[in-house]
């Protein structure tokens, strides 16, 4: 557990310095290539310069996006490499548009904001709330995988309960469990309790209003089990809590794989597909740059994520994995398993809580065209 706590604390430092757009010159098209003393030659040079400027203007137009600003939903205390360019505007420059970073506390809120027209791209939205929205008829598309993680999303029990895998059914009887509803944390909690033989009727399940609220309630002893993600998990462990099961056990024993996605309103993709592709391409570039020099970038990313005091969140061995575009398009992700995972999650939520019956086929909600358009 001590090793896992160290790993958990490692997950917390990656912060990004991102925000103001740096103005860049559109480029002088000067073609001062001749110093002839004859007027006729000067005129020819001027004509050539004019032609070069026209060519540059055309090039600028061909590389400009169909939008000047993109509203992107993201989570605080959830560090990702693209936050390295969030405050200094370098990510904006890589995309080719001003990025308005809008913080949200849940994936469900992200779906609602996209449907309301307030968000163009939801970055690192949980798969479960997205699947729930699709199951409810929302016209959204899953266009990429943001991050894969296991240990970063979990349930922490008060040490005084002495919960183990073997005694969970008895030790958790009558326990107060705080969790968000309708997201992957909720799905993992329900699946874990079923796997451990815990009767949900024996639990007092309270809806969380955010990870910080859950961590605070855990620290004061108002709840017995807190389920959250990111820095809130670290905070609860720092308060003396214990994991009921590790993320690795969720994967190996229950078959739960935890990852977040990139999603868009279908209408935004149809109108501004170039912007979606540019965002995904820039994110890939920033992921690669972080992987090449994480020690330099992690403190900057941590500051952007508001996690300076939580430790090196991205420094852990297995905290976050950022699949490449090639991997995302493969059968383990957008090529097949993602649609099946959405089906399974919706069915589980419907069976173990008050969810709607699954629609039967989620493949239509997955659109690989934007990733495929990246050269």
Regions found by a protein language model. Give the residues of each.
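C-terminal motif of bacterial Sec signal peptides marking the signal peptidase cleavage site
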Residues: 14-17
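Bacterial lipoprotein signal-peptidase II cleavage site
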Residues: 19-38
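N-terminal low-complexity, Pro/Thr/Ser-rich intrinsically disordered segments
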Residues: 34-71
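Short, glycine-/small- and polar/acidic-enriched structural segments
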Residues: 60-208, 217, 224-230
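Ligand-binding "clamshell"
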Residues: 132-144, 235-250, 309
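Pocket-lining segment of extracytoplasmic ligand-binding domains
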Residues: 213-304
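Secondary-structure end/capping motifs
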Residues: 271-352
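Conserved C-terminal helix/tail region of periplasmic/extracytoplasmic solute-binding proteins
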Residues: 342-375
């Amino acid at each position: 557990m001590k090793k896992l706590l160290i790993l958990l604390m490692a997950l917390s430092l990656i912060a990004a310095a991102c925000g103001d757009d740096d103005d860049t010159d559109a480029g002088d098209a000067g073609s001062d290539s001749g110093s002839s003393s004859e007027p006729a030659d000067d005129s020819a040079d001027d004509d050539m310069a004019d032609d070069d400027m026209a060519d540059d203007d055309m090039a600028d137009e061909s590389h400009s996006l169909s939008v000047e600003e993109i509203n992107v939903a993201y989570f605080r205390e959830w560090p990702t490499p693209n936050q390295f360019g969030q405050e200094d505007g370098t990510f904006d420059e890589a995309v080719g548009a001003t990025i308005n970073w809008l913080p949200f506390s849940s994936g469900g809120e992200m779906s609602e904001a996209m449907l309301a027209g307030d968000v163009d791209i939801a970055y690192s939205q949980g798969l479960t709330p997205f699947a729930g929205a699709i199951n409810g008829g929302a016209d959204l598309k899953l266009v990429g995988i943001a991050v894969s993680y296991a240990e970063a999303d979990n349930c922490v029990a008060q040490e005084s309960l002495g919960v183990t895998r073997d005694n969970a059914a008895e030790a958790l009887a009558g326990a107060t469990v705080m969790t968000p509803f309708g997201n992957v944390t909720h799905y993992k909690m329900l699946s874990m309790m079923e796997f451990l033989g815990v009767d949900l009727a024996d639990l007092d399940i309270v809806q969380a209003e955010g990870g910080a609220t859950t961590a605070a309630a855990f620290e004061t002893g108002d709840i017995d089990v807190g389920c959250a993600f990111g820095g809130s998990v670290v905070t609860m462990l720092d308060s003396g809590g214990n994991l009921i099961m590790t993320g690795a056990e969720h994967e190996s024993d229950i078959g739960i794989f935890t990852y977040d996605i990139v999603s868009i309103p279908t209408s935004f993709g149809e109108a501004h597909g170039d912007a979606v592709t540019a965002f995904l391409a820039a994110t890939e570039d920033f992921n690669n740059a972080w992987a090449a020099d994480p020690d330099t970038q992690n403190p900057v990313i941590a500051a952007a994520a508001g996690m300076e005091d939580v430790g090196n969140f991205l420094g852990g061995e297995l905290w976050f994995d950022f699949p490449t575009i090639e991997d995302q398009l493969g059968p383990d992700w957008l090529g097949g398993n993602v649609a099946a995972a959405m089906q399974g999650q919706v069915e589980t939520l419907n069976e173990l809580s008050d969810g709607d019956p699954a629609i039967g086929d989620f493949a239509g909600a997955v659109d690989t065209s934007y990733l495929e358009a990246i050269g």
